[in-house]
């Protein structure tokens, strides 16, 4: 989960309010101290923390709850609203108004910028846009090959020339090339910057003046903490920052530094990086993000993941009919596990469900994820005949499958039991129910 430690601390603070027998000034001040402690531990700038919590305390002490709302509920609402305001109030997506829309990506060395360029290209491709990527990073020889490696499999073209040393010329040629190809979006990758490197910042300005981007996007490493504050200011002076993408938030204890950067620049966070895979990027929506952070769930986000999956998976009418007749195979189950994997880490999905929040321990979630991975490995060790006709799997085959997958016979039997339960469930459902379920889980 993004900002996991901060989320747990804030969720526990809200639980303290919810469980209190009554709400008085002392409890409100204790709440404020807990929030301050949680944000400072997440490396949010102290001055910004004090501004935020002063407003929470003022509102909690002065405002009267609307009719039908308890004092506790109103205080939780205040915390939610102020944190949302702190992060930008509302989602501000990148607007694709003109074709081509040109996006210039800038960032500190090691921020994950080049990987983020690939993620963004894939994100827009999945939504029906034709995307071209320009590599104008002449400082890092491997940048062009890295982009090719990430994007070739998705048939997203990358323009670059590892021998060319003029970044401005390369950027201009790349943009002109993709304009002639009629793409919808051109994403221009640049060399990693450092706030002290004036020559590189000057080059960035010159590229901007030549290609005239519709938006300049600053990529910030979520693990650097408060350093993000000063780096964002340095970029603010160098070029108008249209927006921010924060990377590496999935495992960072210092992600709060990114919040400081947003407040410093006044630029909205438009995307966040939530993992290492190319699909691990999501639009940043402050209300939904804060809702998840506080353990309140994100149903809209969950539904969007289902919808995205539906677009990628083709469901055939004959498959639905087959499942209804009880003809559900291990190969179908394998497809289901693959679809679940595409939705993202189990931990991330569970955080979107209201009521679960942080109530499930990480070790329990980890066991669930490991079990799914193990099932997939076991099925990889089966023959095509066994996947299509699981009834032929006797004890001799179970032993062979266990040896081939590096698991135990008990693990293989557990998978087969799970398969039989699913087969029984599908056979008992009507066509409409099964069709809906199949579309959601990629069968």
Curated annotation (Swiss-Prot):
InterPro entries, per the entry: AAA+_ATPase (IPR003593), P-loop_NTPase (IPR027417), Signal_recog_part_SRP54_M_sf (IPR036891), Signal_recog_particl_SRP54_hlx (IPR013822), Signal_recog_particle_SRP54_M (IPR004125), SRP/SRP_N (IPR036225), SRP54 (IPR022941), SRP54_GTPase_dom (IPR000897)
Chain residues that bind GTP: 107-114, 189-193, 247-250
Broad class of enzyme this protein falls into: hydrolase
Keywords from the UniProt entry: Cytoplasm, GTP-binding, Hydrolase, Nucleotide-binding, Ribonucleoprotein, RNA-binding, Signal recognition particle
Major localization listed first in the record, in broad terms: cytoplasm
Domain of life: Archaea
EC code: 3.6.5.4
SUPFAM superfamilies assigned to the protein according to its UniProt record, in alphabetical order: Domain of the SRP/SRP receptor G-proteins, P-loop containing nucleoside triphosphate hydrolases, Signal peptide-binding domain
Gene Ontology CC: signal recognition particle
Subcellular location: Cytoplasm
Record field: catalytic activity: GTP + H2O = GDP + phosphate + H(+)
Any one GO MF annotation of this record: GTP binding
Example GO BP: SRP-dependent cotranslational protein targeting to membrane
The keyword Zinc appears for this protein: no
Main function: Involved in targeting and insertion of nascent membrane proteins into the cytoplasmic membrane. Binds to the hydrophobic signal sequence of the ribosome-nascent chain (RNC) as it emerges from the ribosomes. The SRP-RNC complex is then targeted to the cytoplasmic membrane where it interacts with the SRP receptor FtsY.
Assembly and binders: Part of the signal recognition particle protein translocation system, which is composed of SRP and FtsY. Archaeal SRP consists of a 7S RNA molecule of 300 nucleotides and two protein subunits: SRP54 and SRP19.
Family classification: Belongs to the GTP-binding SRP family. SRP54 subfamily.
Domain characteristics, as noted in the entry: Composed of three domains: the N-terminal N domain, which is responsible for interactions with the ribosome, the central G domain, which binds GTP, and the C-terminal M domain, which binds the RNA and the signal sequence of the RNC.
HAMAP family: SRP54
Protein's UniProt name: Signal recognition particle 54 kDa protein
Phylogenetic placement of the source organism: Archaea, Methanobacteriati, Methanobacteriota, Thermococci, Thermococcales
């Amino acid at each position: 989960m993004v900002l996991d430690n901060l989320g747990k601390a804030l969720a526990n603070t809200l639980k303290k309010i919810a469980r209190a027998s009554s709400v008085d000034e002392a409890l409100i001040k204790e709440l404020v101290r807990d929030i301050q402690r949680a944000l400072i531990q997440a490396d949010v700038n102290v001055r910004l923390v004090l501004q935020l919590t002063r407003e929470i305390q003022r509102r909690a002490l002065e405002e009267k709850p609307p009719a039908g709302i308890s004092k506790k509920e109103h205080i939780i609402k205040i915390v939610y609203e102020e944190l949302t305001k702190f992060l930008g109030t509302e989602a501000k997506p990148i607007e694709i108004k003109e074709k081509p829309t040109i996006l210039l990506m800038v960032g500190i060395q090691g921020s994950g910028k080049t990987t983020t360029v690939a993620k963004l290209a894939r994100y827009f491709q999945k939504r029906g846009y034709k995307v071209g990527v320009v590599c104008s990073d002449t400082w890092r020889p491997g940048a062009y090959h890295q982009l090719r490696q990430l994007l070739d499999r998705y048939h997203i073209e990358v323009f670059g020339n590892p021998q060319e040393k003029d970044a401005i010329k390369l950027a201009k040629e790349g943009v002109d090339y993709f304009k002639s190809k009629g793409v919808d979006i051109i994403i221009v990758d640049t060399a990693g910057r450092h706030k002290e490197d004036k020559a590189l910042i000057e080059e960035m300005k010159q590229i901007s003046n030549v290609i005239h981007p519709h938006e300049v996007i600053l990529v910030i490493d979520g693990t650097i903490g408060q350093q993000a504050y000063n780096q964002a200011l340095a970029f603010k002076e160098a070029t108008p920052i249209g927006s921010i993408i924060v990377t590496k938030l999935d495992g960072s204890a210092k992600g709060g530094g990114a919040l400081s950067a947003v407040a410093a620049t006044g630029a909205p966070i438009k995307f966040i990086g939530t993992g290492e895979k190319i699909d691990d990027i999501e639009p940043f929506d402050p209300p939904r993000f804060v809702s998840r952070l506080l353990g309140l769930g994100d149903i809209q986000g969950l539904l969007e993941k289902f919808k995205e999956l539906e677009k990628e998976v083709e469901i055939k009418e004959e498959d639905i009919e087959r499942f209804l007749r009880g003809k559900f195979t291990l190969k179908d189950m394998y497809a289901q596990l693959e679809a679940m994997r595409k939705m993202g880490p189990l931990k991330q999905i569970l955080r979107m469900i209201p009521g679960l929040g942080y109530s499930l321990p990480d070790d329990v979630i980890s066991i669930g994820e490991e079990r799914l991975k193990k099932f997939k490995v076991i099925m990889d060790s089966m023959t095509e005949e066994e996947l299509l006709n699981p009834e032929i799997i006797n004890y001799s085959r179970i032993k062979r499958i266990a040896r081939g997958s590096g698991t135990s016979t008990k693990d293989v039997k557990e998978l087969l039991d799970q398969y039989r339960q699913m087969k029984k469930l599908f056979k008992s459902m009507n066509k409409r129910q099964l069709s809906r379920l199949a579309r959601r889980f990629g069968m």
